[in-house]
From Swiss-Prot:
InterPro entries: Ribosomal_uS14 (IPR001209), Ribosomal_uS14_bac/plastid (IPR023036), Ribosomal_uS14_CS (IPR018271), Ribosomal_uS14_sf (IPR043140). PANTHER family: 30S RIBOSOMAL PROTEIN S14, SMALL RIBOSOMAL SUBUNIT PROTEIN US14M. One of its GO terms (biological process) is translation. Part of the 30S ribosomal subunit. Contacts proteins S3 and S10. GO terms for molecular function: rRNA binding; structural constituent of ribosome. Binds 16S rRNA, required for the assembly of 30S particles and may also be responsible for determining the conformation of the 16S rRNA at the A site. This is Small ribosomal subunit protein uS14. The keyword RNA-binding applies. The keyword rRNA-binding applies. Belongs to the universal ribosomal protein uS14 family. GO terms for cellular component: cytoplasm; small ribosomal subunit. Disulfide bonds: none annotated. Gene3D superfamilies: 30s Ribosomal Protein S14, Chain N.
Amino acid sequence: MAKKSMIAREVKRQALVERYAEQRAELKAQGDYIGLSKLPRNSSAVRLHNRCSITGRPHGYIGKFGISRIKFRDLAHKGQIPGVKKASW
């Protein structure tokens, strides 16, 4: 489990990215790179890192489900992810 501060930091970054998305797009379209540099650093989508929504784990992230491979396996075995079943051939 990731530290609570790391999870909170990532949530804060996500909020900043959403807040400044339109403004960043306009400045980028105009080519105003000085204006872009004056925006907060964490408002750039490049600074986001994919994290598991349950544990905050940064590695082994499955984007389609928004969780790590470990939690995915656990929830899939319990049948808590709709449409997912163990492969057999």
